[in-house]
């Protein structure tokens, strides 16, 4: 089972404050473990424009049709001071990893310098921090009914309103997450 370019959808019984009702986009999954970014937990009072200001990045030439008032996500509980930018191609930045044909993760400053300009990737999600699982840990959490999994959908990742991502990600696999009981069993 390789869950790279999949969503983890928190089951209703998962009450951890960071992961409760979360959707995690899995960026890497292999025999050593998994790494992902929570894509539906906006940080309070932090927008992309605020990140650019803190880093003293001024988009030039500024394309006013590109909104920089989008929220920055809490990507996970690890390295909350590090930025992770999920975006559509191109992937010609200094530190980019291609996750799928249509999704790239970049951690270098050069992608931030394109935000708000005509060089910006068409779809962008900025997060601080990430989530990771050790070898076998994620698989066990799935067996323990902590998560549903679904192939990632770019509309949900980049365009769906943040408040709807948890419900809409579950709908990808035919589940109405809002009507699920808080406790699941095994058949």
Swiss-Prot record:
SUPFAM superfamilies: VC0467-like. Disulfide bonds: none annotated. It comes from the Bacteria. GO terms for cellular component: cytosol. Belongs to the UPF0301 (AlgH) family. PANTHER family: UNCHARACTERIZED PROTEIN YQGE, UPF0301 PROTEIN YQGE. This is UPF0301 protein YqgE. It comes from Escherichia coli O127:H6 (strain E2348/69 / EPEC). The lineage of its organism: Bacteria, Pseudomonadati, Pseudomonadota, Gammaproteobacteria, Enterobacterales.
């Amino acid at each position: 089972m390789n869950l790279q370019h999949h969503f983890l959808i928190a089951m209703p019984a998962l009450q951890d404050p960071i992961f409760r009702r979360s959707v995690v986009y899995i960026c890497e999954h292999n025999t050593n473990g998994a790494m992902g970014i929570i894509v539906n937990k906006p940080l309070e009072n932090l927008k992309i424009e605020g990140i650019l200001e803190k880093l003293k990045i001024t988009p030039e030439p500024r394309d006013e049709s590109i909104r920089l008032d989008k929220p920055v996500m809490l990507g996970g509980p690890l390295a909350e001071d590090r930025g992770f930018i999920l975006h559509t191609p191109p992937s010609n930045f200094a530190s980019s990893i291609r996750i799928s044909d249509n999704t790239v993760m970049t951690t270098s400053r050069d992608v931030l310098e394109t935000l708000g300009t005509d060089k910006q990737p068409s779809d962008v999600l900025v997060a601080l921090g990430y989530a990771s699982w050790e070898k076998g840990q994620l698989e066990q959490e799935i067996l323990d009914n902590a998560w549903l999994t679904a192939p990632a959908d770019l509309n949900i990742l980049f365009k769906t309103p943040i408040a709807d991502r948890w419900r809409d990600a579950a709908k990808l696999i035919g589940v109405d997450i809002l009507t699920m009981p808080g406790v699941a069993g095994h058949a």
